[in-house]
Amino acid sequence: NHPAVPMVGEGSGFIVSKDGIILTNAHVVDDAQKVTVKLTDRREFEAKVLGVDAKSDVAVLKIDAHDLPVVRLGDPRALQVGEWVVAIGSPFGFENSVTAGIVSAKGRTLPDDSFVPFIQTDVAVNPGNSGGPLFNLKGEVVGVNSQIYSRSGGYQGLSFAIPIDVAMNVGKQLQAGGHVTRGKLGVGIQDVDQALAESFGLDVPRGALVSSVEKGGPADKAGLKE
């Protein structure tokens, strides 16, 4: 028998308060026995994980430091498709690497994730970029780089960021109570395609079809039907 060798992972993050609150991705720190934060001035701190929310892929860390420089937050709702954005992170351990691209789409829902209206970009994101900030050209953080969509496992021009307002809301709830409370309607919906539109007598596909209603849920109590 051989002793287990500790696995070391890397990711990115950014400071949102002068007293050492840091945002990153949940998958960067989940199940970690020890988290070490290295700042751009090369100081290192052992971090405490204040909370992790896997559904939104957001985690909040705290380091014992004061008077730290903090990012400025922007409004992701003001982003326009085609607008330039910039990511900063440490892909493959190459610290403070900057990549740029454009906003490809807003409000994307991924197949395995229905809790975040992702910002889709073509910014190059690689292992180690996760949890790093996505900036607009005003130098404001508008998103948290989270994941890529790829058939090969490598970057193929599809990267996704959590809108910063979503991430900050999750972060505040994690700091306050260690968990996130979400509302729900209790319905399943699907897109209306051409075939469904014709069956309903619509001239063009539009709207959404209520495909299921959770028994006893808010929508059911309000009288919504399939």
Protein language model features and the residues they cover:
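Serine-dependent protease modules
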Residues: 1-222
